[in-house]
Curated annotation (Swiss-Prot):
InterPro entries: AAA+_ATPase, Chromosome_initiator_DnaA, Chromosome_initiator_DnaA-like, Chromosome_initiator_DnaA_CS, DnaA_C, DnaA_dom, DnaA_N_dom, DnaA_N_sf. HAMAP family: DnaA_bact. The lineage of its organism: Bacteria, Pseudomonadati, Pseudomonadota, Alphaproteobacteria, Hyphomicrobiales. It comes from the Bacteria. This is Chromosomal replication initiator protein DnaA. Belongs to the DnaA family. It comes from Nitrobacter hamburgensis (strain DSM 10229 / NCIMB 13809 / X14). One of its GO terms (molecular function) is lipid binding.
Length: 475
């Protein structure tokens, strides 16, 4: 860009900022760049499709007016997505504006914001208009095992769907701990879904959703924000546990309902099941639980070994001589049990040490380099449903009895024991425990906890029963 064009662009941006206001400018125009000026046509770019669509729908005439104040002969704006420009073959020059272009009633040329030739959206995450995508996180690089087979199969089915197909799982809700592959699956769905041009698949973190909604509220463009989201064919939301704020949650709930009711697919991931998302509104949890809820469990040794081998193959694509002996692989698979990120980190460390020091990978090197990645085995995470099931079996009652309003002695005591265990073995709050036991008040739970605490200190039989239940739940 020449100095003259740069000066013109600075003046146009100043006019635009004055026209729309600082908040709107910062939200929607701060990342817009000038690419070129050709006669009557100005070519500009934005980083995402979402941003392009928004500007095209709501600010086209204002953008054109700002340019015409600087260059009266400009009658056309070509707005493109930068990532598509980088990935596509060079586009042909924009044709000169048609002198017969349609006019408004006052004789002004109609505003034209046109998207020129672009590559498929899968070419780069920016073209999706959502949160950044890692090009490594595809189905091809996802390693399957017993703990993630169902989640993988469900995600593949979503990704391979076509517009108009009947939807089997909606929403698809995947939950897992940190580093177990849920983000990998969600991004794989997005890459695969956007590989063609038929469907619009948008990947957003909960944080990005919140930011977009709050920015729309501040700029008084909330309606456009809602319309844009509800025009998506597949909405993919990651890290839902971070969704905060009543108004944001309400908007997410409305969006969720609108998309599902319209036959659009929704895929969600979080670090816990819907019932454990205490900060979310009951309506949101209920709608999420109404779809397919899939847990991705901890990585078994065989799966950990598969992940290690996969990461080594990736490393060898750039470092052909890199090799990890089988004894080292076995050691890593047995010793690093926490999550897949630690396994990838271990391979990266061995690669760096081997290449930088020009030494082969040995078991001694591995033991030294990954020492801090070997963590104590975490205790099994206990769920309230597990407690209810084990207690019901122990006392020969049904789980529905524990949740009911029955006050008979053979039900009251097991219910109190289950509430006591829920308080001592989980991180759930008293109100949440009460809700999970038939919608009881938190004072009822507190009474049950104190009652059992007092009894186990005096009643050895009950104390033994409670200890037995704890062992069964922790095994």
């Amino acid at each position: 860009m020449s100095d003259i064009e740069q000066e013109r662009w600075s003046r146009v941006k100043g006019r635009l900022r004055s026209t729309v206001g600082e908040d709107i400018y910062s939200s929607w125009f701060a990342r817009m760049d000038l690419e070129s000026v050709h006669g009557e046509s100005v070519r500009m770019s934005v980083p995402t499709r979402f941003l392009k669509s928004w500007i095209q729908a709501h600010y086209a005439e204002r953008v054109l007016a700002c340019w015409q104040a600087e260059l009266p002969d400009v009658h056309r704006i070509d707005l493109m997505v930068r990532s598509a420009m980088r990935c596509a073959a060079p586009a042909k020059e924009a044709p000169a504006a048609d002198p017969r272009r349609p006019e408004h009633g006052d004789g002004r040329a109609s505003t034209e914001l046109k998207m020129v030739a672009t590559a498929p959206a899968s070419a780069n995450h920016d073209a999706l208009g959502g949160s950044p995508l890692d090009p490594r996180l595809t189905f091809a690089s996802f390693v399957t095992g017993r703990s993630n087979t169902l989640a993988h199969a469900a995600a593949r089915q979503v990704a391979e769907g076509r517009r108009g197909d009947s939807i089997m799982f909606n929403p698809l809700y995947i939950h897992a701990g940190v580093g177990l592959g849920k983000t990998h699956l969600l991004q794989a769905v997005t890459w695969a879904g956007n590989a063609g041009t038929e469907r619009k698949v948008l990947y957003l973190t909960a944080e990005k959703f919140m930011y977009g909604f709050v920015a729309a509220l501040k700029s008084q463009t909330a309606l456009a924000f809602k319309e844009a989201l509800r025009g998506i064919d597949v909405l993919v939301i990651d890290d839902l546990q971070f969704l905060q704020g009543k108004s944001t949650q309400a908007e997410f709930c409305h969006t969720l309902n609108a998309l599902i009711d319209a036959g659009r697919q929704v895929v969600v991931a979080a670090d816990r099941p819907p019932s454990d998302l205490e900060s979310l509104d009951d309506r949101v949890r209920s709608r999420l639980a109404g779809g397919l809820v899939v847990e991705m469990g901890s990585l078994g040794e065989e799966l950990r070994l598969g992940i290690l081998k996969s990461r080594i193959e990736v490393a060898r694509a750039h470092h052909a001589s890199f090799s990890v002996p089988e004894p080292v692989l076995d050691y890593l698979a047995k010793a690093i049990t926490h999550n897949g990120r630690d396994l990838e980190g271990a391979i990266n460390r061995l690669l760096a040490h081997s290449k930088l020091n020009a030494q082969p990978v040995t078991l001694e090197m591995a033991e030294r380099e990954v020492r801090d990645l070997i963590r104590p085995q975490e205790p099994r995470r206990i769920k309230i449903e597990d407690i209810q099931r084990v207690v019901a079996r122990q006392y020969n009652v049904s789980r529905s009895d524990l949740l009911s309003s029955r006050r008979t002695a053979n039900v009251v005591r097991p219910r109190q024991v289950a509430m006591y265990l829920a308080k001592t073995l989980t991180l759930r709050s008293l109100p949440e425990i009460g809700r999970r036991f038939g919608g009881r008040d938190h004072t009822t739970v507190l009474h049950a906890v104190r009652k059992i605490e007092a009894l186990v200190s005096k009643d050895t039989t009950l104390s033994d029963e409670v200890e037995l239940l704890k062992r069964q739940l922790q095994e």
